[in-house]
Design a protein with these regions (language model features):
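Short glycine-rich, Thr/Ser-proximal phosphate-binding strand/loop in the N-terminal lobe
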Residues: 2-45, 142-169, 174-175
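Short, aromatic/basic amphipathic alpha-helical patches
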Residues: 72-79, 229-232
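Phosphate/pyrophosphate-binding loops at sites that engage ATP/ADP/AMP, CoA/4′-phosphopantetheine
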Residues: 43-59, 80, 203-215
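Short glycine-aspartate micro-motif
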Residues: 2-6, 61, 125-129, 218
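Phosphate-binding/catalytic loop of phosphoryl-transfer enzymes
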Residues: 75, 83-87, 92, 96-164, ...
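ATP-binding/phosphotransfer module of carbohydrate and carboxylate kinases, centering on a glycine-rich
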Residues: 2-4, 30, 157-257
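Short, well-ordered alpha-helical microsegments
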Residues: 69-71, 135, 227
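N-terminal low-complexity or amphipathic/hydrophobic leaders
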Residues: 61-71
Length: 257
């Protein structure tokens, strides 16, 4: 069994995988000021709550888009499990062909998503990861990473409206009864949810047109389960895509005995 951790700007996903299957998955808030001990305590809590046996863990891997947390979490894993995790970055074997202007700029989370997508779903492929930012990655028929799009995440858009307007309230991410809102709360809900779904549909259609094909579309990340069902395109939901990708990368890079 391996420990897999993905550090995002808003949340950290902690999970264990065995034989390519996700055993458990937990989500905690990213805190750049947390100490090694605090993150080690979070790991212990995740294992305890899922009754997972730490003695069964024989490896660990993490990806991160928050450099301030990467080393802290690495040390926390070592403190709790007495293992040094692999860190997704330069030197890690991915098998991914990256066709963008500067491959070094591609975020580790997008690399991990792509590795998992290629392994589990038909190509060509569009991967939508709905986190702090919503990222759209495009994989061609040969599994090459062609590029993508970045747009504000649903929560970021919501926070910007609430903080920069005098009278628009915070709302829950739940569907209004009607698309056409008749009060501020329902108008916001409709705009945020259906607006983001419409944006994704538009990007999917444009990508398909540019590639002159119909891509498999996979969605993952915090609000994907809310937005994807509202899209008119067929979208596969996979909440464990990142953990699956980390598991694959661990197998590609684990130390040989």
């Amino acid at each position: 069994m391996i420990l897999a951790i993905d550090i995002g700007n808003t949340n950290i996903v902690i999970g264990c995988c065995a034989d390519g299957q996700v055993i458990f998955r937990e989500r905690v808030s990213t805190n750049p000021t947390a100490t090694v001990l605090e993150y080690a305590a979070m790991l212990k809590m995740a294992f305890d709550m899922n009754r997972a046996d730490i003695t069964a863990v024989d490896g660990a891997i993490l990806s991160s888009v928050v450099p301030a947390v990467t080393l802290t979490m690495r040390d926390a894993v070592h403190k709790y499990l007495h293992l040094t995790p692999l860190v997704v970055g330069p030197g890690i074997k991915t098998g991914l062909r990256i066709h963008i202007d500067n491959p070094a700029q591609l975020g580790s989370d997008l690399v991990v998503d792509a590795v998992a997508g290629i392994h589990h779903y038909p190509l060509p492929q569009i991967i939508i990861d709905m986190g702090t930012a919503t990222t759209v990655s495009v994989l061609d028929a040969e599994g090459g990473y062609r590029g993508g799009m970045i747009l504000p995440g649903v929560a970021v858009s919501h926070d910007a409206l609430a903080s920069r307007t005098a009278q628009l309230p915070k709302v829950a991410f739940e569907l209004p009864k009607h698309t056409i809102g008749t009060n501020s709360v329902d108008c916001l809900k409709s705009g945020l949810l259906y607006g983001n779904a419409g944006a994704l549909d538009g990007l999917i259609d444009r990508n398909n047109a540019e590639l002159n094909t119909s891509c498999t579309v996979v969605a993952t990340g915090g609000l994907s389960s809310v937005i994807a069902p509202l899209c008119r395109n067929k979208i596969i939901l996979d909440d464990d895509l990142l953990l699956k990708g980390l598991s694959i990368l661990f197998e590609k890079n684990k130390p040989k005995n």
